[in-house]
Amino acid sequence: MVTYLLANFGGPRTSQEIVSFLQALLTDRDVTGGMIPSMLHRPLFSYIAKRRAPHVARQYAYLGGGSPIFQDTERLAQNLSQELQASVIPFHRYLPETHRETLQALQESQGSIVGIPLFPHYTFAVTGSIIRFFLQHLPEKPISWITQFGVHPEFVSCMQQHIRDCLAAQQIAVEDCYFLFSVHGLPQRHIRLGDPYAQQCQASFEALRGELEGKIAFQSKFGIGKWLDPSTQEVCQSLRTKKRYIVIVPFGFVSDHIETLHEIDHLYVPILLQKGYRVVRIPAINASSRWVSSLAAIVRSSPQETSLEPLLMP
């Protein structure tokens, strides 16, 4: 008997969970470690989380007060469970209010556990953080992990068809489009530590792009230090093309949340509109029936990692 652990980023369901969400995220040393001395890390980033909460709350107000990522992940878990004919337990990494229920469900599970982080490309800061969480909180339950699927044929074909369907629904010809494939950024220091994220993103981009005209860019920088480039904002500012449409494809996100629904729409789309382009943002694949089928195929065919130490931030 196999139990599947479907792990996603998590997000506040209501405005009341914004502070706890930000504290869980910003005090995670896999995310913000290395910026300041370790003894100052938790108190400083807890303070920053509280200070940033009102600003972030205004962004979530644009989404109705909370993130849709919770419900999308829950729905995907239910549908994937039906597809796999197995138990699928959802996990929301930075929604601490849900952690006890997840840990209890895993504790009561029988047989082996396979972790499925919903991130196409592996990084210490996200998938590595999820793995570390369970090593710390559930050490008695060994979990094998599917750590990346960015070049898996099922993911590539699912995304390519999703893009075509979205454009066809708006009667937009692919030939009229320039494609900006946007993925979450990462500090360069992580790459120097051996993080494979940048290489995996590039390989995934090349597989997805095919014959399409476009380029990759990195969004969502925060904090100090040099991050992967080019940034999505820089590409939007410098872009020159004769194509009528700029199509933004957030291919590193399988679930819509604040970085697709607010950041792209409010920071990047206006730049392109001011330059006279028509702009289309491709929604995430979320819990679509095609993605459920593709994800099930990925789960059935992907290798599982059991040697976990190399997967963690050094």
From Swiss-Prot:
Cellular compartments annotated: Cytoplasm
The lineage's top-level taxon is Bacteria
Top EC group: lyase
Keywords of the record: Cytoplasm, Heme biosynthesis, Iron, Lyase, Metal-binding, Porphyrin biosynthesis
Question: Where, in this chain's numbering, is Fe cation bound?
Answer: H184, E259
**Pathway given in the UniProt record:** Porphyrin-containing compound metabolism; protoheme biosynthesis; protoheme from protoporphyrin-IX: step 1/1
Q: Which InterPro entries match?
A: Ferrochelatase, Ferrochelatase_AS, Ferrochelatase_C, Ferrochelatase_N
Could you tell me what reaction this enzyme catalyses?
Answer: heme b + 2 H(+) = protoporphyrin IX + Fe(2+)
Write out the GO MF terms. ferrochelatase activity; metal ion binding
Keyword Phosphoprotein recorded: no
List the GO cellular component terms. cytoplasm
Question: Which EC number(s) does the record attach to this protein?
Answer: 4.98.1.1
**UniProt key word Nucleus:** no
One GO BP on record is: heme biosynthetic process
PANTHER family under this entry?
FERROCHELATASE, FERROCHELATASE, MITOCHONDRIAL
Can you tell me which family this protein belongs to? Belongs to the ferrochelatase family.
The UniProt function text for this chain reads:
Catalyzes the ferrous insertion into protoporphyrin IX.
Name-wise, this protein is Ferrochelatase
- Protein's organism: Chlamydia trachomatis serovar D (strain ATCC VR-885 / DSM 19411 / UW-3/Cx)
